[in-house]
Amino acid sequence: FGLDTVVYNREECEKLGMGAFLAVAKGSSQEPKFIHMKYQVDNPKKKIAIIGKGITFDSGGLDIKPASSMLSMKDDMSAAACVLGVMSIIREFHPQVEVHGIIAACENMPGCSAYKPGDILTAKNGKTIEVDNTDAEGRLTLADALCYACELGVDEVIDLATLTGACMVALGTNAAGIMGNDDTLVKNLINTAERNGERYWELPLWDEYFDSLKSDIADMKNTGSRWGGASTAGVFLKKFVKDVKWAHIDIAGVAFLDK
């Protein structure tokens, strides 16, 4: 693509402190890869990072999915494919914007070394996470990716993920859910989607959603109440965003289509 690209292997991710991402990858024989692509220009008007969830197959881990729910899980890297698509064509448009494309790619498998419910993980920013369910793995990989992106000195971070079934329950397959910490960024993304024939619907990101994620032995759990699951996941991700405008787009409903 003509981009500056770095691909970190397992050992390099360990040195970077990506304990949450690497935990998800432990159950698979496939090597995890953390991918950072960069489109760079002189005197950029702003700097943006886009992150795509890159679970190349999601069995659910030890909290394994039913067989029928696993059939489409090769598509759990849909957001990573979106990021690759953007980065593959960005040079054709010559935007005066520095863009970082970030993907934490791995499988979530129930191998003999798999991470377990009850494990305590340490993310890149030092926050600890109690594993409540190994099938809530996407947010763990995104946690370290968000920390990494926030260290790049960017103005905005946008993450995309096939993150929650709860978003599909709320919005069906006709819209993606969006939330974030900056109203202007969120509204700009909603308006841009509408102009291009897509639908984003803003979901709340109230602090009260974090109540169900509280842990007695860690800074947070990776899952909480069954209610408000899309927003609960968003509040979890927010804990790994620092000093940057951020938006989270849950594309589960619009990615897993069979038509």
Task: Show which residues each predicted segment covers.
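A generic structural signal for tightly packed, nonpolar segments enriched in small/aliphatic residues
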Residues: 1-259
